[in-house]
Amino acid sequence: MKHKIITFGELMLRLSPDNNERFTQAHSYEAVYGGGEANTAVSLANFNVDTRYVTKLPKHTIGQSAVNSLRQYGVDISRIVRGGDQIGIYFLEKKTSQRPTNVIYNRNGSAFALATKGDFDWDSIFDGATWFHFSGITPAISDNMAEITIEACKEAKKRGITVSCDLNYRSKLWSSEKANKVMSEVCRYVDICIANEDDAVGIFGMDASKSDKEKNAYIAEELTKMFPNFKMVASVWRTETSITTFKLQSMIYTEGKAYYSQEFFMNILDYIGAGDAYCAGIIYSLINDFDPQKAVEFSNAASCLKHTVSGDFNLVSVDEVMKLAFAKAGNEVSR
């Protein structure tokens, strides 16, 4: 079966001070484009999966530059709506040693935030589609976008399209109360859910400490009780092992059983987009009929490799992911 993946969300301009400076020091900024669903689309395109990205961007040259950032990797940009005045921007102060990452959003009033239902022709967008992916960031952007996301889910389900959602709770975008109200409706249409402990706590108020079970398995089990339509819950988490090193592991929960990946110990160049790379790994695994253990290993390796790539996009191939996931290699020189 030939698959076509649709991802839907906001493509933003990311500005980061050079040389790990603070905002108060910065005189120059590195500019790249990214956004959860766009990052997933680029990953899938690099895996040679037919992928269409849907958003709304201004017609000016910055908007066109954002479109070009996707086109160069083979993402189908034919359904991107053009209009509005502003592109969403986020300022990123990168984590350095004990200093945490700091993000400031400037996206209120962006073309995507102000989009209306009439901007998106779902018959055209879903033409030939087999999978629809979005994140919880999209409905958090504005009330309009919450309504549009629900409409998109309904349209996808009407067409028998598989729906996946990365819950991706962002406290800077909406309150727990509002997230709970909207995502409780959205999740009724979701088949594959990607969620971690922060998402479960922030949106649904779960407390894994009350259970003797491993917390990610507990959260996945509780989510499937809340939403019996979930065929799978997947989770990836990063644990700090020292100031400079981290441990990465992930889990897939399906049919009442949890499957865990191997652990990767790593240094981080850029972790933005690592969760989106994981989503791409899950989607790629499922459309290629990987069993749960193979799927969790592949997806975890895809996320691990993203930590080695600067910018939002995970510029790696299926072969590279497979090699890390299953050949247990990566220290030797590739000749």
Model-identified regions with their sequence ranges:
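Conserved post-catalytic alpha-helical subdomain immediately downstream of the catalytic base
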Residues: 262-328
